[in-house]
Structures are given as structure tokens and as C-alpha cells.
Amino acid sequence: MIKFAERVGITLDDVDKLSIIHVSGTKGKGSTCAFCESILRHQGYKTGFFSSPHLVEVRERFRINGIPITREKFTNYFWDVFGKLEKTKESADGAMPAYFAFLTVMSLHIFLKEEVDVAIMEVGIGGQYDSTNLIRKPVVCGVSSLGLDHTSILGDTIDKIAWHKAGIFKPGTPAFTSPQPDNALDVMEERASEIGCPLSVTPPLSVYESNGPPLNLGIAGHKQRHNAALAVQLCKVWTDHRRGNRVRQKSSKEESCRTELSNMEASRLPPTVIEGLKHCRWDGRNQTIKKPGITYYLDGAHTLESVEQCIQWFKTVSSEESKQLSGRLVQVLVFNSTGDREANVLIEPLVNCGFDAAVFCPNIVLSTLNSVVARSTKTDVMNLTVTKESQLNRVLANMLLFERLAIKRLKQQIHETEMTQSDSSCSDAKRRKMDGDFIDKGDNSQSVCDIEDCVITKDFPCISSALTWATQGKEPNISSQSFIEIPSKLRNADHIQILVTGSLHLVGGVLGLIGPE
């Protein structure tokens, strides 16, 4: 990474000139960075924010004052960086950076050229070996909540993952972490001690609310309180550093990081911090988009913990909305999972939500590339690292897994009903019908089984077709397609609530299709 940066004309001394907040974590690191950006922007600082992945366009990864750089600026900066790398390729034995490494170098180039006051850098994967870890003198480091993700790269246990995430710690640089499992915190404390980095666990937002009104967060979901609390601490250290105030640094021989900040004096947050938290926006995370007859609930949850949080959020907000609606309401799940993630871990809690239908598709926006919509969205959201066939196989596997779990759930519900009924003749008949209806339907049937309680399932080759079916063709921003038969259970619903989850790339594809709010 250092050599790639140097070939573009960026030295480590240049990187040191950037005033950086560096954030790793499994869940919520992007939201934490977004809160940091909003807080500091509301305090009048010029912010630079490098994030990943993008949802619709790659330029989203580079934000100045909270706004993605323009297409014109992106083009200019891209060719500037690429051209310098291309010119020096021969002397570097043909070496060129991989996709994320290139974007990391480009982000440093942009922030230096734009002369930002603060550069907020979100880690891509892990931390220790991440492309962003060429940063050697950040002002402060943060670690958001940990969970099992990218296990083929980072390891299959929380403590192994914690080792990688703590790899961004730097000597003498204060670091803060959201509350973590004990085994993860053990590893992080050990790494902090080895590196010489003062580590502290952030206090909850409630310590600030004790001296003031409840805080309103611009990103929905109860777990966002952890991310906001971490962001508050990161920004406090950054602003203290900016103003020349001495930041207390706990040595590795002092008390455990688990107790230090819990004893700190609570203070009321400045109005600019409160406003920054309130007006923070981070698309694709607990996001609601309402249209006539349709409400989209979008969350890129892709770990067990984040899916559980997503479900809790969805149940709360969809229930609140349903009280304001009249007529027939149906709920549809649109799902995909990718990479080395265990789909059963993500799908099982979703099965228990009681959706009327579940739709499965790859992160392919359109299956036909000559569409007007495809021409404007396909390049930024295409994944060239996997074949279309493998993506479709994964989709089918996800659907079949959902069906098996749905059948298991339904049988269990009927069994529990039988146990509480003195006269079980009706349930016996229902069970006999169920046993006859649970058959393997290899024709991509629209239903797991034929009885009324069964959830309808359907797989599609692209997001556009999936949304056409899920919305019954009511989504105005999706061009008309060939007729897709809609089952009677969903037909003529007065309102459709659609939860899109399992993959940020899926959420991005949906956002690209349904257009700006």
C-alpha cells in the first residue's frame, strides 16, 4: 500500500498531515463514521469521509461535507490516480493495486487535494491487514461492535476477529470501543498493551441524557445508540486535539479499560453534537421509503446480530405504520446473502417474522443489460468476482433453506396448537393435509405448500424482476416487464410492506431502481 501511495505522489508524511479518525468493527462501523462526520460538520469543520461499500455509485465512498463527490470530480481524481499508477507500472514489475486498495489511495489523494479538516476512514475488512492501515498517526481510533463476518479471512471466533480489528491501534493514539464480549475485550486489551495504545470502553448515551433531554438519532434502530456513543467519544477526542487540549492517555498499567470511562464525569453534549446526531443520514441502514401503496424497509444486515436488530426495528416501525393504514396489508421479504456467510443463521430468525411471501434474488440489478435503467446503474453495482451461475445457485439454495425452515416452523406451530386443544380433529386433518402438501417442487413454485398458513416463496434472476413481483407491478420507477403471475394471497393488497435485507449490495441495487425519495 505504501508503494502504491508513493507512486501516486503520496508519502507517509503526507498521510500524517491528514487529521484522521480511523474506525474498524463488524457491525456499525459505517454508521459510527457517519455520526462522526455529521457531528464534526455541524461544528463547522470541513469533513472527508471514506466508506465502503457503496450502494448505488462508487463515488458515494468519497464524501466531502457529507455529500458524495460529483461525477466530474470523481472522474478527474480517478484518472489522476490511475494515470500515475499506470505510468509507474513497468518500474514496479507491473504491480497495480486491487480494487479496494486503489480506492483507498484515491481517498487519500482526494482528502489531501480538498484540504479537509478531518478525514474519517472506515476500514474495509478486518483492520490489521486492511488497505487503510497504512495510516500511522491517526488522532483517534474506534472499534464498533464485533460479530462473526468474513470468517474465511478473519477467523471463525470473536477473539480471532478482535485481533484483526484491534490491528488499527497505534502507539500513543487513544482508542475507544463499543461494549464487546469479554473474550473479545481480552484480546483488544492485550493488543492495546502490546502496541502502547490507551484503550477505553465508551459509556452509553444515557450518561449524557441524565443531564438533558433524550437524544434523537438520525439513523433508526436501537443498536445505533452504541454507534452514536462511540462517535461522541471519537469526536470529543478529535476536537480536543484540534483545539490543542491535552488528551488524557491511560497507560497499559492503569485500570482496565472496562471501568475507566464508566467513572468519567458525565457532561451535557453541546448543541452542535446533538444536532449532528439528529440530522445524520446513512442510507441502507434501517431506512424507510414510503410510496403510494408501498413501504420499503431497507437494512443491509448480514450478520446474526444485525439481522436480529433489523427484525426488531422492522417489527416496530411496520407495526406503527399498520395502525395508520386501512384495507388489506401484506408483508414481503426480499433477501439475498453472499460470500462465506452462513445463510441459515440469517434466514432462521427471518422465517419467524411471519411474512406473507419471501422473494430471493442475486445482487444483479437487471438480467438484460440493454435496458435504459441498466445502462445507468449496472457498472457501479456489478460484481465481477463471481459468476452469474454461482449467484443464481446461491439464490436457489437460500430459497430452499427458507422453505425447509418455514415448514419446520409451521409443523411446530400446529403441534403446539394440538397440545392445547382438547378436540384436535381439525388440527389432525390440517396435519394430514400438510404432510401431503410438503413436497419438493423443483419448478420454482410460488408456495412452499398449498395450505393457507404457508409462506409464498419465489426466486428471480435479478432485483428488478423480484421487485416487480413483490410490488405487484406498482413500483413506478421500474419499467414494465413481461407479465409475472402474482398469487391470489398477495393480489390486490391495499398496501405492501417490503423488507429488503441480507446484503448491503442488494439494498444498493434496490435503491438504484426505486430512485431518489
What spans do the regions from the language model cover?
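A glycine-rich beta-strand to alpha-helix segment
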Residues: 482-515
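N-terminal leader/targeting and accessory segments in enzymes
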Residues: 1-27, 31-46, 176
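Extended acidic/charged loop-beta regions that coordinate divalent cations
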Residues: 53, 106-153, 185-222
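ATP-dependent carboxylate-amine ligase catalytic core
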Residues: 6-18, 42-136, 152-154, 182
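Membrane-proximal helix-turn-helix segments that form the acceptor-binding/catalytic region
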Residues: 162-170
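C-terminal helical cap/extension that packs against the catalytic core
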Residues: 181-191, 296, 304, 348-494
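Nucleotide phosphate-binding/pyrophosphate-handling subdomain across enzymes
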Residues: 118-121, 130-142, 146-147, 160, ...
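Short glycine/serine- and small hydrophobic-enriched flexible loop segments
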Residues: 106-112, 232-240, 512
